[in-house]
Amino acid sequence: MATLQQQKIRIRLKAFDRRLLDTSCDRIVETANRTNATAIGPIPLPTRRRIYCVLRSPHVDKDSREHFETRTHRRIIDIYQPSSKTIDALMKLDLPAGVDIEVKL
């Protein structure tokens, strides 16, 4: 089992809105630093672009198409030397609904 110095929490964040993601990252890093834990990040990961091709016409005209895309922005934050106060503060943190959070200990 890892000792307290070797423990780390890895937080992966995903969102469609980059600004919402960045504000969430800032809040997590600020909370970790306030509880005397070392926060590394946010580390930006490659943005995933998903492109959808749709026919404009409901019937014929296959030549007329329209493209839509969704961009998924991702970040990683590593928190080293977390204490019980750090974990409690992160659990109480209120983050926006548009951000998907995955936590690994």
UniProtKB/Swiss-Prot annotation:
Coiled-coil residue spans: none
A Pfam family per the record: Ribosomal_S10
Keyword Ribosomal protein recorded: yes
Molecular function (Gene Ontology), one example: tRNA binding
InterPro entries hit by this protein: Ribosomal_uS10 (IPR001848), Ribosomal_uS10_CS (IPR018268), Ribosomal_uS10_dom (IPR027486), Ribosomal_uS10_dom_sf (IPR036838)
Any single Gene Ontology cellular-component annotation: ribosome
Keyword field: Ribonucleoprotein, Ribosomal protein
GO biological process, one term: translation
Transmembrane annotation, as ranges: none
Keyword Ribosomal protein attached: yes
Gene3D superfamilies hit by this protein: Ribosomal protein S10 domain
Oligomer status and interactors: Part of the 30S ribosomal subunit.
UniProt family annotation: Belongs to the universal ribosomal protein uS10 family.
Function of the molecule: Involved in the binding of tRNA to the ribosomes.
Protein name per the record: Small ribosomal subunit protein uS10
Gene that encodes it: rpsJ
